[in-house]
Amino acid sequence: MEILILGHTGLLGNMVKSYFEYCNIQVNTIPNNIRWNSLEFKKFIIDNNFDFIINCIGAIPQRTKDFSINYELPIWLDENSNSKIIHPGTDCEMDNDEYGISKKIARDYIVNESKNTKIIKTSIIGTELNSNYSLMSWFLSNKDGDEVKGFTKQMWNGNTTLTWANFCLDLINNWNKYNNETILYSDCVSKYEILKNINTIFNRNIKILPYDSISINKCLVGDIKTNNIEIQIKDLKKFIEK
């Protein structure tokens, strides 16, 4: 079985690669100098004819204002490759900003028109390799004694990148069992509670100040219930320390 991971150095891709290799599953990656939408990229995908492609490439608001790759790439993969493709969905698909719209375009295409792509939809937290844009990596980049705000009214029920990778492997092994979109969800918690868990589990002493901002509920109604986020963060820490 030939598996390609796109975006293997990003937040999600680096965990999927690490987890699959930990499970003794050989994975392939695309050379960093071959960029999306180039002839070399398209030739690489088509010529290699992978059994599965896990698409972890995506543009996020912290890094760019051009989000076209979020829908152009997954649609192109579905229309032009014979591989089975796994695509990450997000709770931001409900947002009406350019990022949310770009994710929704991809989601609507896959759910309604896709021939060989399936979505694992959830919001994710995890550790990055080379940057600190995501919630967990940003938080852990602070020094002990630093003060940060913890939003008490911003609710979330996502999962760690490790949980995503674990389910991704199950999806590969049981492809026909799942619909075009599977939503993973955990217990709904506040961003403040998430930071408190990270602080404790990673043995940090960052001061988290409760902050009552406007209420935002990003909790998804899902298909598969996962462990609560405290357990997931503990499992993530154990895994990255192996």
Where are these regions (language model features)?
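N-terminal Rossmann NAD(P)H-binding glycine-rich loop of SDR-like oxidoreductase domains
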Residues: M1-C23
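Short-chain dehydrogenase/reductase
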Residues: L6, F67-Y71, D95-R107, Y133, ...
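SDR active-site strand-loop-helix element
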Residues: L6, I53-I57, I85-D91, I120-T122
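Conserved catalytic-site region of short-chain dehydrogenase/reductase
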Residues: H87-I101, I125-N130
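NAD(P)-dependent short-chain dehydrogenase/reductase
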Residues: K104, D108-T163, L169-D170
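Mid/C-terminal beta-alpha module of Rossmann-like enzyme folds, strongest
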Residues: A165-N217, I240
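Amphipathic terminal alpha-helices
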Residues: N227-K242
